Amino acid sequence: IHAAYVRLDARWEQLSFVGGLRYERTKTDGEAFRFDVDTNRGVLQNVDRSYGELLPSLHFRYELTPDSILRWSYSTGLSRPHYPDTVPRLVISDEDREAEAGNPDLKATYSHNLDVSWERYLRPLGLISVAAFHKRLQDPIFIGTSTIGSGVESLRITRPENGDSGEITGLELAWQQTFDQLPAPFDGLGVYANYTWADSEADLPFGIGKTELPGTSRHNVNFAVFYEKHGLNTRLAYNSRSAFIQEFDAADRGLDVYWDRRELLDFTASYQFTSQWTAFAEINNLTDTKQRRYQGVRNRVLELEQFGRAWQLGLRFEY
């Protein structure tokens, strides 16, 4: 990847501006064996691709008051496909009559992004913010499953494909506050809360309809309580996200694959007892949450994962 950019900064009293233009040139080379059904042999196939994109951006910041800021921005972005997904590969499982394939024609996803936000800084140390965003996507990437053949000779192939376009519209609310005004020892307490609502829609490949964007939950919640004082730092954090689509089925949308709603509770703590030594502890997934993947409807379970709690204790030395 080669890139070059220009940037302009300007300020007029309470209004400041940052603008830029970035050019990125991407080149990929790869090779893999492709199975040839006519010769019943593997054939070495080379894939060479290159493309360039212009990525403009505009960012405005206006100080309504010393403690209140309004922001507006337009930007563009490029999300490249995972390199293994672009390799011309085909891995077949004879037992399940299923296969995974790469897609050498997979395109990068280009996005146009609009964001507007209002921030209010709280005393002694805190923040309230409200933000809205809208993104338009070109060539979003999906993981799709299709079936070739019929009966016992059929084969279900899963591979990445590009859709035509998509969009996401959302709202984000955030609040962070430390309570320095409380009497000791409670003056080290603080909270952080964040909620994001996102509505997404995209055209599926092959013109078979529309769906939500893969990996995009409609609801995301984060909440944390923390304590920071005299070298002691502790944090109890809760995260929740609603169900989201992972894969679509080209023949039967009732077989689309989803990850179910998930909730996690994590705890971290550290204590710096000298300028160089810090003891720390981390416990992830305190509630031993299970993760469920289902097909079409929630009671058609494909996979149930339970990894348990993860513990980590240690000492950190800095010099």
What role is predicted for each listed range?
Residues 13-14, 65-67, 124-125, 180-189, ...:
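Short loop/turn motifs that connect adjacent beta-strands in outer-membrane beta-barrel proteins
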Residues 1-2, 49, 78-129, 133-137, ...:
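Outer-membrane beta-barrel signature, preferentially recognizing the C-terminal barrel domain
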Residues 133-136, 154-248, 287:
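Gram-negative outer-membrane beta-barrel transporters
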Residues 4-10, 58-62, 116-120, 173-177, ...:
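Residues on the lipid-exposed face of transmembrane beta-strands in outer-membrane beta-barrel proteins
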Residues 15-21, 56, 70-72, 128-130, ...:
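Transmembrane beta-strands of outer-membrane beta-barrel proteins
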Residues 29-37, 83-89, 96-98, 140-147, ...:
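Outer-membrane beta-barrel translocator domains and adjoining extracellular loop/strand segments
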Residues 1-67, 91:
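Signature of Gram-negative outer-membrane beta-barrel scaffolds
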Residues 240-249, 270-319:
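C-terminal beta-signal and adjacent terminal beta-strands/loops
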